[in-house]
Amino acid sequence: MNRRPLHFVTREKEWELIQRSETIVDSSSFDPSDTAVIMASPDYSATVAMHLAHAWSRDGDALSIIPVDVTYPDEDSQYYIDKMRSQYIDITKFKKLILVEACIIRGGNWEWMLNVLQDDFRYNRKDITLVTMVENINSRVKSDYVAEYYDDDKQENMFYYEKYNKHWPIR
């Protein structure tokens, strides 16, 4: 089996990307009283979301974190869309949202999440900030802030904690 070379994110690299994200994101309008972090894909994004929510704290108050499960590439998104819709009350009590994801490969999860937030929850795009540590240059939805880009056609992104996952196609 031939695999693409890895774009491997070590624990040290993850920390570097988190710190870079803290630095590049304009957090001047983030206020814990009206802004929340949406932790997309908690199994991958818990670490970065937690660090950023605390880094963007004001007067000793960290941003709230709301976990949202997302699809793997081989899953239908409808279940996850319905599940996010069930979080309406938790999410809409905030005026601004920062969606945080460890890695954006295709952009499909950003796409349906933005659709739910804008069409169902009535958020304006200007009140939603998309942040990722790593993004494929060919993602169909582009994040507002990216700590590092890679090319998924040439490399396979992998984090140090990942093991075999039946949902990820090997190509």
Placement of each model-derived feature along the sequence:
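A short acidic (Asp/Glu
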Residues: T47-L52, N109-W112, V141
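Short glycine-rich phosphate-binding loop at a beta-alpha junction
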Residues: D31-Y44
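Short, glycine/charge-rich flexible loops or terminal/linker lids adjacent to PRPP-binding catalytic cores
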Residues: H54-L97, I105-N115
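Glycine-rich helix-loop-beta junction characteristic of Rossmann-like nucleotide cofactor-binding loops
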Residues: V25-P32, Y88-T92, F121
